[in-house]
Amino acid sequence: MNILILTPLYKISGRESLERNTEVIHHFAKYWVNEPDVNVQVVNTYLNPGRNLLFLLKKGELKKYFTPFDYEVDGVKVHLVEVQQIPFQNKFWKFQNKTIRKAIEDVAETFRPDVILAHFPVRYTGVIDRVCENIPKIAVMHYTDLWISQKHIHQVESIGSKFDVTFTRSKSLLEESKKLGIKNLSDFIVYSGVPYAESRRSADIAFSKDNPVKLLYVGKLIERKHLDYVIKAMGQLKREKNLMLTVVGEGPEKQRFEDLSKKYEIEGQVRFIGKLTREEVYRAMGDADIFIMPSVEETLGLVYLEAMMNGCLTVGTKGEGIDGIIEDGKNGFLVDPGSEKSVVETLQRILRLPNDEIQQISLAATETGKAFNEPDMAKRYLNRIRQLVREKGGNA
């Protein structure tokens, strides 16, 4: 079975100057190519901001922007074509569609796909019905697709009519997509997985009067992650419990968060340690008591699953991608979106739990994290693709 993946976000090799280098979709494809009857080809329609064109011009590398680039990573072949990042439905959108269509047709001519997967399908509604006729086409909705479809409602009709079926990336995204009325919407959720590894937790979590409770945040230091809510909550709870927060990551809001910890007079309890390797992050998770990231606009957030696999009492946000995987009070905790008060109340709730209940939740989190591992999630997704292709009479 030949699987053609369309996406504006994919792992990049050989073009280090390109910023949007993400592995989320590659975490599926790299397992699929190990199947004896499966070939995978990716068309990466990379969105390049205008400021990058000026950078390339200054370096004398503007020619690269206009030249498609082929590379291979972990056995997956990728055809990268750069298009300008412009507002949706801009008058230049049709010109971009021509570039995208040509890239798909050039690859499909020799690859001859049995099925097409479009991650971020709003980027392809202008071309998908004009390429590879009579081949099953699957749309996979991310939160970006939801936001654009809510603003440009005609996209709902396009996704529902130009693709054979639409999958989503989380339970909350599925529920929001149902509200839009997408005709071909499936209940199948394309869950991501974490690299399978043993938990780094060396001892059970147990709160005591003598030892501080160790909180951990891992992520970009940007506004929508709401690390400020955590720092403010610590400021309010500092007389109730000795809390220590380790912050892993970098970002434009770092100085603001540091200043906030000083404002609440807890700068000695908040450590900003920058970026870590995955192994170092796992060790930090194994040592932490509570992992907390009350972010919004989060399709899933693999870091939650990694924290759960390492036994952390994990705090996510209701209505976001992790909602439905975390069951509040059973294998983790959920706060209300955009609510500082909810963060405070949830931390208070956790800190007042008896140690036997804490250990039960930690164990349940570990089991959930291990269940959502990369190989199993990739196999689950591939089996659903095979089923659809067979239903359409194709080669699977």
Place the predicted regions along the sequence by residue.
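N-terminal subdomain of nucleotide-sugar transferases
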Residues: 1-65, 393
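Conserved donor-binding/catalytic core segment of Leloir-type glycosyltransferases
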Residues: 4, 206-225, 231-234, 246
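Carbohydrate-associated surface elements
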Residues: 172, 193
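Nucleotide-activated donor-binding/catalytic signature segment of Leloir-type glycosyltransferases, i.e.
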Residues: 258-276
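Short alpha-helical donor nucleotide-sugar binding micro-motif in glycosyltransferases
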Residues: 275-276, 283-288
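Aromatic "clamp/platform" in nucleotide-sugar-dependent glycosyltransferases that forms part
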Residues: 296
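Short hydrophobic beta-strand element within catalytic cores of glycosyltransferases
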Residues: 313-316, 326
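Conserved acidic donor-binding segment of nucleotide-sugar-dependent glycosyltransferases
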Residues: 328-329, 333-340, 349-355
